[in-house]
Regions:
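C-terminal amphipathic helix plus adjacent low-complexity
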Residues: 363, 368, 373-428
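Conserved donor-binding/catalytic core segment of Leloir-type glycosyltransferases
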Residues: 213-231, 237-241
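Aromatic "clamp/platform" in nucleotide-sugar-dependent glycosyltransferases that forms part
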Residues: 295
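Short hydrophobic beta-strand element within catalytic cores of glycosyltransferases
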Residues: 312-316
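Donor nucleotide-sugar binding/catalytic pocket of nucleotide-sugar-dependent glycosyltransferases
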Residues: 143-154, 161-206, 216, 223, ...
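Nucleotide-activated donor-binding/catalytic signature segment of Leloir-type glycosyltransferases, i.e.
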Residues: 257-282, 289
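N-terminal subdomain of nucleotide-sugar transferases
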Residues: 1-68, 118, 240-243, 401-428
Length: 428
Protein backbone atom coordinates (compact mmCIF):
# COMPACT_ATOMS: atom_id res chain seq x y z
CA UNK A 1 0.00 0.00 0.00
CA UNK A 2 1.32 3.44 -0.94
CA UNK A 3 0.01 6.56 0.80
CA UNK A 4 0.60 10.24 0.10
CA UNK A 5 0.29 12.51 3.14
CA UNK A 6 -0.52 16.01 1.86
CA UNK A 7 -0.08 18.95 4.22
CA UNK A 8 0.59 22.69 3.94
CA UNK A 9 3.97 22.67 5.77
CA UNK A 10 6.20 19.85 6.96
CA UNK A 11 9.45 19.51 8.86
CA UNK A 12 11.06 18.42 12.09
CA UNK A 13 11.24 22.06 13.18
CA UNK A 14 7.67 22.93 12.14
CA UNK A 15 5.45 22.48 15.18
CA UNK A 16 2.04 23.82 14.17
CA UNK A 17 -0.79 21.61 15.41
CA UNK A 18 -1.91 20.17 12.06
CA UNK A 19 1.65 19.98 10.73
CA UNK A 20 2.92 18.06 13.76
CA UNK A 21 -0.16 15.85 13.57
CA UNK A 22 0.63 15.08 9.92
CA UNK A 23 4.28 14.31 10.66
CA UNK A 24 3.47 11.94 13.50
CA UNK A 25 0.87 10.10 11.40
CA UNK A 26 3.22 9.88 8.40
CA UNK A 27 6.06 8.47 10.49
CA UNK A 28 3.85 5.88 12.16
CA UNK A 29 2.06 4.80 8.98
CA UNK A 30 5.50 4.36 7.39
CA UNK A 31 5.94 1.32 9.65
CA UNK A 32 3.09 -0.39 7.79
CA UNK A 33 3.03 1.11 4.28
CA UNK A 34 5.06 3.06 1.75
CA UNK A 35 4.51 6.72 2.66
CA UNK A 36 5.44 9.91 0.80
CA UNK A 37 4.79 13.40 2.13
CA UNK A 38 3.68 16.04 -0.38
CA UNK A 39 4.04 19.60 0.87
CA UNK A 40 5.21 23.11 0.03
CA UNK A 41 8.47 25.00 0.43
CA UNK A 42 6.91 27.24 3.09
CA UNK A 43 8.21 27.43 6.63
CA UNK A 44 6.13 30.38 7.90
CA UNK A 45 2.34 30.00 8.07
CA UNK A 46 1.68 33.75 7.90
CA UNK A 47 3.56 34.55 4.67
CA UNK A 48 4.00 31.11 3.00
CA UNK A 49 7.36 32.37 1.70
CA UNK A 50 9.43 29.72 -0.12
CA UNK A 51 12.16 29.24 2.48
CA UNK A 52 12.83 25.53 1.96
CA UNK A 53 14.31 23.95 -1.16
CA UNK A 54 12.00 22.34 -3.71
CA UNK A 55 12.64 18.67 -4.40
CA UNK A 56 12.89 15.48 -2.38
CA UNK A 57 14.47 14.96 1.02
CA UNK A 58 14.13 12.40 3.80
CA UNK A 59 12.94 13.38 7.28
CA UNK A 60 13.09 10.65 9.92
CA UNK A 61 13.11 8.07 7.14
CA UNK A 62 10.03 9.42 5.32
CA UNK A 63 10.46 10.82 1.76
CA UNK A 64 9.24 14.44 1.56
CA UNK A 65 8.49 16.11 -1.78
CA UNK A 66 8.39 19.91 -1.62
CA UNK A 67 6.74 22.16 -4.20
CA UNK A 68 7.04 25.95 -4.47
CA UNK A 69 4.28 28.31 -3.39
CA UNK A 70 3.20 30.51 -6.31
CA UNK A 71 2.96 33.70 -4.26
CA UNK A 72 3.20 34.74 -0.62
CA UNK A 73 0.11 35.63 1.34
CA UNK A 74 -0.85 39.30 1.40
CA UNK A 75 -2.42 39.93 4.83
CA UNK A 76 -4.44 42.94 3.64
CA UNK A 77 -5.94 41.02 0.70
CA UNK A 78 -6.71 38.02 2.89
CA UNK A 79 -8.38 40.29 5.46
CA UNK A 80 -10.58 41.87 2.77
CA UNK A 81 -11.67 38.51 1.40
CA UNK A 82 -12.28 37.23 4.95
CA UNK A 83 -14.54 40.20 5.72
CA UNK A 84 -16.50 39.49 2.54
CA UNK A 85 -17.16 35.79 3.11
CA UNK A 86 -17.52 35.82 6.90
CA UNK A 87 -19.59 38.99 7.35
CA UNK A 88 -21.53 39.65 4.11
CA UNK A 89 -23.77 37.85 1.63
CA UNK A 90 -21.42 36.65 -1.09
CA UNK A 91 -20.81 34.23 -3.96
CA UNK A 92 -18.99 30.94 -4.34
CA UNK A 93 -16.45 32.84 -6.44
CA UNK A 94 -15.82 35.08 -3.42
CA UNK A 95 -15.10 31.96 -1.34
CA UNK A 96 -12.71 30.59 -3.97
CA UNK A 97 -10.92 33.96 -4.00
CA UNK A 98 -10.72 33.80 -0.19
CA UNK A 99 -9.18 30.32 -0.43
CA UNK A 100 -6.59 31.54 -2.95
CA UNK A 101 -5.72 34.51 -0.73
CA UNK A 102 -5.36 32.26 2.32
CA UNK A 103 -2.97 29.92 0.51
CA UNK A 104 -0.59 28.27 0.33
CA UNK A 105 -1.29 28.19 -3.42
CA UNK A 106 0.98 25.68 -5.17
CA UNK A 107 -0.03 24.75 -8.74
CA UNK A 108 3.03 22.48 -8.93
CA UNK A 109 1.80 20.46 -5.94
CA UNK A 110 -1.67 20.10 -7.46
CA UNK A 111 -0.21 19.07 -10.84
CA UNK A 112 1.85 16.38 -9.13
CA UNK A 113 -1.24 15.05 -7.35
CA UNK A 114 -3.23 14.96 -10.61
CA UNK A 115 -0.51 13.34 -12.72
CA UNK A 116 0.44 10.80 -10.04
CA UNK A 117 -3.05 9.76 -9.00
CA UNK A 118 -2.32 6.21 -10.13
CA UNK A 119 0.92 6.04 -8.15
CA UNK A 120 -0.78 6.08 -4.75
CA UNK A 121 -3.53 4.00 -3.21
CA UNK A 122 -4.64 6.81 -0.90
CA UNK A 123 -4.11 10.55 -0.49
CA UNK A 124 -4.37 11.65 3.14
CA UNK A 125 -5.14 15.40 3.15
CA UNK A 126 -4.60 17.43 6.31
CA UNK A 127 -6.61 20.56 7.22
CA UNK A 128 -9.80 21.00 5.20
CA UNK A 129 -9.58 24.80 5.03
CA UNK A 130 -6.42 25.07 2.94
CA UNK A 131 -5.90 25.31 -0.81
CA UNK A 132 -4.11 21.98 -1.22
CA UNK A 133 -6.80 20.01 0.62
CA UNK A 134 -9.74 21.59 -1.23
CA UNK A 135 -8.37 21.32 -4.76
CA UNK A 136 -6.39 18.14 -4.11
CA UNK A 137 -9.46 16.33 -2.77
CA UNK A 138 -11.37 17.33 -5.89
CA UNK A 139 -8.56 16.07 -8.13
CA UNK A 140 -8.40 12.55 -6.59
CA UNK A 141 -11.78 12.24 -4.88
CA UNK A 142 -11.95 8.44 -5.16
CA UNK A 143 -8.68 8.14 -3.23
CA UNK A 144 -9.07 11.12 -0.89
CA UNK A 145 -9.19 10.70 2.89
CA UNK A 146 -9.46 13.95 4.84
CA UNK A 147 -8.14 14.80 8.30
CA UNK A 148 -10.13 18.04 8.71
CA UNK A 149 -8.62 19.44 11.95
CA UNK A 150 -11.65 21.75 12.07
CA UNK A 151 -12.21 24.28 14.82
CA UNK A 152 -15.41 26.12 15.64
CA UNK A 153 -14.83 29.26 13.60
CA UNK A 154 -16.52 31.01 10.68
CA UNK A 155 -14.65 28.92 8.10
CA UNK A 156 -16.98 25.98 8.75
CA UNK A 157 -19.85 28.21 7.63
CA UNK A 158 -18.56 28.59 4.06
CA UNK A 159 -20.61 26.86 1.36
CA UNK A 160 -17.57 25.62 -0.55
CA UNK A 161 -16.72 22.94 2.00
CA UNK A 162 -19.83 20.70 2.40
CA UNK A 163 -19.36 19.17 -1.09
CA UNK A 164 -15.79 18.27 -0.12
CA UNK A 165 -16.88 16.75 3.20
CA UNK A 166 -19.54 14.67 1.43
CA UNK A 167 -17.35 13.79 -1.55
CA UNK A 168 -14.15 12.36 -0.04
CA UNK A 169 -13.98 8.65 0.74
CA UNK A 170 -13.64 9.11 4.50
CA UNK A 171 -12.79 11.58 7.25
CA UNK A 172 -10.50 10.95 10.21
CA UNK A 173 -12.03 13.12 12.93
CA UNK A 174 -10.21 14.46 15.97
CA UNK A 175 -13.19 14.44 18.33
CA UNK A 176 -16.90 13.75 18.70
CA UNK A 177 -17.50 17.50 18.72
CA UNK A 178 -15.66 18.02 15.44
CA UNK A 179 -17.67 15.26 13.79
CA UNK A 180 -20.99 16.64 15.06
CA UNK A 181 -20.13 20.14 13.84
CA UNK A 182 -19.05 19.02 10.36
CA UNK A 183 -22.01 16.68 9.94
CA UNK A 184 -24.32 19.58 10.77
CA UNK A 185 -22.83 21.93 8.18
CA UNK A 186 -22.60 19.11 5.60
CA UNK A 187 -26.22 18.15 6.17
CA UNK A 188 -25.26 14.49 6.04
CA UNK A 189 -23.84 11.62 8.01
CA UNK A 190 -20.19 11.63 6.98
CA UNK A 191 -18.15 8.43 6.52
CA UNK A 192 -15.24 8.18 8.88
CA UNK A 193 -13.97 7.43 12.35
CA UNK A 194 -12.90 9.41 15.41
CA UNK A 195 -9.19 8.79 15.73
CA UNK A 196 -7.22 11.81 16.99
CA UNK A 197 -3.48 11.42 17.43
CA UNK A 198 -1.00 9.67 19.67
CA UNK A 199 2.04 11.15 21.34
CA UNK A 200 5.64 10.13 21.89
CA UNK A 201 5.62 10.14 25.69
CA UNK A 202 8.70 9.09 27.66
CA UNK A 203 8.36 5.86 29.61
CA UNK A 204 9.82 7.39 32.76
CA UNK A 205 9.57 11.17 32.97
CA UNK A 206 11.56 12.67 35.84
CA UNK A 207 9.66 15.48 37.57
CA UNK A 208 12.46 16.11 40.07
CA UNK A 209 14.97 16.55 37.26
CA UNK A 210 12.84 19.42 35.96
CA UNK A 211 12.50 21.00 39.41
CA UNK A 212 16.25 20.88 39.96
CA UNK A 213 17.16 22.05 36.46
CA UNK A 214 14.86 25.08 36.58
CA UNK A 215 14.94 25.80 40.31
CA UNK A 216 11.23 25.17 40.87
CA UNK A 217 10.25 24.34 44.47
CA UNK A 218 6.65 25.50 44.85
CA UNK A 219 3.50 23.89 43.46
CA UNK A 220 2.72 25.08 39.94
CA UNK A 221 0.22 25.06 37.12
CA UNK A 222 1.64 24.83 33.61
CA UNK A 223 0.67 26.13 30.19
CA UNK A 224 2.33 24.59 27.12
CA UNK A 225 1.95 26.10 23.67
CA UNK A 226 2.07 29.35 21.75
CA UNK A 227 1.55 32.25 24.15
CA UNK A 228 -1.03 34.15 22.14
CA UNK A 229 -4.29 36.01 22.75
CA UNK A 230 -5.93 33.71 20.18
CA UNK A 231 -5.03 30.77 22.44
CA UNK A 232 -6.78 32.35 25.44
CA UNK A 233 -3.58 33.44 27.17
CA UNK A 234 -4.66 37.05 27.76
CA UNK A 235 -7.67 35.81 29.71
CA UNK A 236 -5.52 33.20 31.48
CA UNK A 237 -3.15 35.90 32.72
CA UNK A 238 -6.04 38.04 33.98
CA UNK A 239 -7.76 35.11 35.70
CA UNK A 240 -4.58 33.78 37.30
CA UNK A 241 -3.50 37.16 38.66
CA UNK A 242 -6.97 37.71 40.09
CA UNK A 243 -6.89 34.24 41.63
CA UNK A 244 -3.58 34.75 43.42
CA UNK A 245 -4.83 38.08 44.78
CA UNK A 246 -7.89 36.35 46.21
CA UNK A 247 -6.53 32.97 47.28
CA UNK A 248 -3.85 31.92 49.70
CA UNK A 249 -1.13 29.56 48.55
CA UNK A 250 2.12 29.44 46.64
CA UNK A 251 1.00 28.03 43.29
CA UNK A 252 2.94 29.51 40.38
CA UNK A 253 2.05 29.60 36.69
CA UNK A 254 4.84 28.32 34.44
CA UNK A 255 4.71 28.90 30.69
CA UNK A 256 6.45 26.83 28.01
CA UNK A 257 6.41 28.01 24.41
CA UNK A 258 7.11 30.94 22.14
CA UNK A 259 5.57 34.23 23.21
CA UNK A 260 3.49 36.31 20.80
CA UNK A 261 1.69 38.03 23.68
CA UNK A 262 3.75 39.84 26.36
CA UNK A 263 4.00 37.81 29.57
CA UNK A 264 3.09 39.75 32.73
CA UNK A 265 5.99 40.78 34.93
CA UNK A 266 4.78 39.02 38.06
CA UNK A 267 6.68 36.97 40.66
CA UNK A 268 4.17 34.10 40.41
CA UNK A 269 4.27 33.89 36.59
CA UNK A 270 7.39 32.51 34.93
CA UNK A 271 8.07 32.09 31.21
CA UNK A 272 10.56 29.31 30.47
CA UNK A 273 10.54 29.85 26.71
CA UNK A 274 11.04 27.03 24.24
CA UNK A 275 12.45 23.91 25.94
CA UNK A 276 13.46 20.41 24.86
CA UNK A 277 10.90 17.60 24.74
CA UNK A 278 12.64 16.03 27.75
CA UNK A 279 12.18 19.19 29.81
CA UNK A 280 8.63 19.68 28.55
CA UNK A 281 7.48 16.21 29.57
CA UNK A 282 9.33 16.38 32.88
CA UNK A 283 7.60 19.71 33.55
CA UNK A 284 4.15 18.38 32.68
CA UNK A 285 4.69 15.37 34.93
CA UNK A 286 5.82 17.65 37.77
CA UNK A 287 2.90 20.08 37.43
CA UNK A 288 -0.11 20.01 39.72
CA UNK A 289 -2.35 20.85 36.76
CA UNK A 290 -2.12 21.74 33.08
CA UNK A 291 -4.24 24.75 32.09
CA UNK A 292 -5.71 24.83 28.57
CA UNK A 293 -7.32 28.29 28.07
CA UNK A 294 -7.93 28.03 24.31
CA UNK A 295 -11.35 28.85 22.87
CA UNK A 296 -10.76 26.87 19.66
CA UNK A 297 -9.32 23.37 19.44
CA UNK A 298 -10.03 20.35 17.27
CA UNK A 299 -8.31 18.01 19.75
CA UNK A 300 -5.52 19.48 21.97
CA UNK A 301 -2.50 17.23 21.86
CA UNK A 302 -1.11 18.97 24.94
CA UNK A 303 -4.12 17.99 27.07
CA UNK A 304 -3.77 14.38 25.91
CA UNK A 305 -0.07 14.40 26.77
CA UNK A 306 -0.84 15.72 30.25
CA UNK A 307 -3.32 12.92 30.80
CA UNK A 308 -0.84 10.39 29.44
CA UNK A 309 1.57 11.60 32.13
CA UNK A 310 -1.06 11.44 34.88
CA UNK A 311 -1.56 15.21 35.24
CA UNK A 312 -5.10 16.64 35.55
CA UNK A 313 -6.31 19.38 33.19
CA UNK A 314 -8.16 22.64 33.79
CA UNK A 315 -9.74 23.66 30.47
CA UNK A 316 -11.74 26.49 28.97
CA UNK A 317 -15.30 25.15 28.96
CA UNK A 318 -16.28 27.50 26.14
CA UNK A 319 -14.31 25.20 23.84
CA UNK A 320 -16.69 22.31 23.17
CA UNK A 321 -13.85 19.90 22.37
CA UNK A 322 -11.94 20.56 25.60
CA UNK A 323 -15.10 20.38 27.68
CA UNK A 324 -16.05 17.10 26.02
CA UNK A 325 -12.59 15.62 26.60
CA UNK A 326 -12.73 16.55 30.29
CA UNK A 327 -16.16 14.97 30.69
CA UNK A 328 -15.36 11.80 28.75
CA UNK A 329 -12.04 11.26 30.54
CA UNK A 330 -13.14 12.43 33.99
CA UNK A 331 -9.58 13.70 34.06
CA UNK A 332 -10.13 17.42 34.34
CA UNK A 333 -12.27 20.37 35.32
CA UNK A 334 -13.45 23.24 33.11
CA UNK A 335 -14.48 26.85 33.57
CA UNK A 336 -16.54 29.44 31.70
CA UNK A 337 -15.94 32.46 33.97
CA UNK A 338 -13.40 33.78 36.45
CA UNK A 339 -15.39 32.53 39.45
CA UNK A 340 -15.41 28.99 38.01
CA UNK A 341 -11.70 29.25 37.16
CA UNK A 342 -10.85 30.31 40.71
CA UNK A 343 -12.97 27.61 42.34
CA UNK A 344 -11.61 24.86 40.08
CA UNK A 345 -7.97 25.88 40.43
CA UNK A 346 -8.40 26.25 44.18
CA UNK A 347 -9.92 22.77 44.46
CA UNK A 348 -7.09 21.20 42.47
CA UNK A 349 -4.40 23.12 44.34
CA UNK A 350 -5.74 22.17 47.77
CA UNK A 351 -6.57 18.50 47.21
CA UNK A 352 -3.84 16.00 46.29
CA UNK A 353 -6.46 13.24 46.30
CA UNK A 354 -8.53 14.99 43.61
CA UNK A 355 -5.41 15.55 41.52
CA UNK A 356 -4.36 11.91 41.85
CA UNK A 357 -7.82 10.59 40.99
CA UNK A 358 -8.18 12.81 37.93
CA UNK A 359 -4.62 12.02 36.87
CA UNK A 360 -5.36 8.29 37.03
CA UNK A 361 -8.58 8.75 35.06
CA UNK A 362 -6.81 10.82 32.43
CA UNK A 363 -4.01 8.27 32.06
CA UNK A 364 -6.51 5.44 31.59
CA UNK A 365 -8.39 7.51 28.98
CA UNK A 366 -5.17 8.24 27.09
CA UNK A 367 -4.09 4.60 27.07
CA UNK A 368 -7.52 3.44 25.93
CA UNK A 369 -7.83 5.86 23.00
CA UNK A 370 -4.57 7.63 22.15
CA UNK A 371 -1.59 5.28 22.28
CA UNK A 372 0.05 4.82 18.90
CA UNK A 373 -0.98 1.18 18.40
CA UNK A 374 -4.61 2.30 18.76
CA UNK A 375 -4.17 5.21 16.33
CA UNK A 376 -2.28 3.15 13.75
CA UNK A 377 -4.91 0.41 13.87
CA UNK A 378 -7.74 2.89 13.19
CA UNK A 379 -5.99 4.28 10.11
CA UNK A 380 -5.09 0.87 8.71
CA UNK A 381 -8.58 -0.51 9.33
CA UNK A 382 -10.11 2.47 7.52
CA UNK A 383 -7.87 1.99 4.48
CA UNK A 384 -8.72 -1.73 4.43
CA UNK A 385 -12.44 -0.99 4.73
CA UNK A 386 -12.33 1.53 1.88
CA UNK A 387 -10.41 -0.90 -0.34
CA UNK A 388 -13.23 -3.45 0.08
CA UNK A 389 -16.03 -0.93 -0.54
CA UNK A 390 -17.96 -1.63 -3.78
CA UNK A 391 -17.65 1.21 -6.28
CA UNK A 392 -21.42 1.67 -6.38
CA UNK A 393 -21.48 2.52 -2.66
CA UNK A 394 -18.82 5.21 -2.88
CA UNK A 395 -19.75 8.87 -2.53
CA UNK A 396 -19.15 11.13 -5.50
CA UNK A 397 -17.71 14.64 -5.48
CA UNK A 398 -20.20 17.25 -6.68
CA UNK A 399 -18.69 19.35 -9.50
CA UNK A 400 -18.20 23.08 -9.14
CA UNK A 401 -21.13 25.12 -10.49
CA UNK A 402 -20.72 26.94 -13.80
CA UNK A 403 -19.36 30.42 -14.41
CA UNK A 404 -22.54 32.39 -13.74
CA UNK A 405 -23.76 30.24 -10.83
CA UNK A 406 -20.42 30.71 -9.05
CA UNK A 407 -20.89 34.47 -9.18
CA UNK A 408 -24.38 34.75 -7.72
CA UNK A 409 -24.19 36.54 -4.38
CA UNK A 410 -26.69 34.29 -2.65
CA UNK A 411 -24.56 32.68 0.07
CA UNK A 412 -25.01 33.70 3.72
CA UNK A 413 -22.10 35.07 5.78
CA UNK A 414 -19.96 32.37 7.34
CA UNK A 415 -20.52 33.86 10.81
CA UNK A 416 -24.29 33.60 10.36
CA UNK A 417 -24.04 29.93 9.41
CA UNK A 418 -21.73 29.26 12.37
CA UNK A 419 -24.25 30.85 14.74
CA UNK A 420 -26.74 28.17 13.73
CA UNK A 421 -24.41 25.25 14.46
CA UNK A 422 -25.36 23.58 17.77
CA UNK A 423 -22.85 24.00 20.57
CA UNK A 424 -21.88 21.79 23.48
CA UNK A 425 -19.87 18.75 24.40
CA UNK A 426 -20.83 15.37 22.96
CA UNK A 427 -21.06 12.68 25.63
CA UNK A 428 -20.32 9.09 24.59
Amino acid sequence: MRIAVVVQRYGAEINGGAELHARYVAEHLARHAEVDVLTTCARDYVTWENELRAGVESINGVPVRRFPVARPRTPELFARHSATVFDQPHSLQDELAWLDSEGPTSPALLRYIETNAGTYDWFLFFSYRYHHAYHGSRAVAKKAVLVPTAERDATVGLAMFPPILRGVRALMFNSFEERAMLQHVAGARLPGVIVGIGSELPERPQPERFRQRFGVQDPFAIYVGRIDENKGCKELFAFFQQHIRNARGRMQLLLIGNSILPVPDHPMIRHLGFVSDEDKFDAMAAADVLIMPSYYESLSMVALEAWGLGTPVLANGRCDVLKGQCLRSNGGLFYESYSEFGEALGALASSPSIRRAMGRNGMAYFRRHYTWPVIERKYLQMFEQLAREPEGQQASMAPLPGYFARRKKVLPPGMKVLAGVPEGAVLQ
